[in-house]
Each structure stands twice: as structure tokens, then as C-alpha cells.
Amino acid sequence: MKITGGRGYVKFDLENGYIMKAEGEMLIDNTFLVYKDTMKSWEVPHNNEKVSDEQVENIIKTSCKMMNKNTIHLIFE
């Protein structure tokens, strides 16, 4: 998975054609707060497919495993 973003969003690229954009905000100490309730849809061309709670949880788990002292830390709320 690739994780990219900007000041008010983060994108989770599953590297299989599926990308999810979530809103959030940059905090202090290299931390980004991800608004979990905005993780509802895939980017085009999969925007008509439903996102399951299990898929969201898998993205969160994978993201947490990828974090280390050299990356921005994500907090999901």
C-alpha cells in the first residue's frame, strides 16, 4: 500500500487499482488525524462499488503496521 496526502486529506493506494481518499488534518509532531467516517468510497473507476467495514479496518491495520519513526503517524478517529 502507498499512502500519500496533503494538508487536509490522505490517500490509501492499495496498488491494485483501488484508491481511497479520507479527510483529516495535520497535527503537531508529524501526526495526521484521519476522519474515519470519511472513509466511505473508492476513487474513480471504482467509485460505484461499496466499501465494507472490513475493508476500512484492513486499510487501518495495514497503515498502522507501516508506521515507523521516519513516517507521519496516522491517528484514526
Where are these regions (language model features)?
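Amphipathic, interaction-prone secondary-structure segments
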Residues: 1-27
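Acidic, low-complexity intrinsically disordered segments
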Residues: 31-77
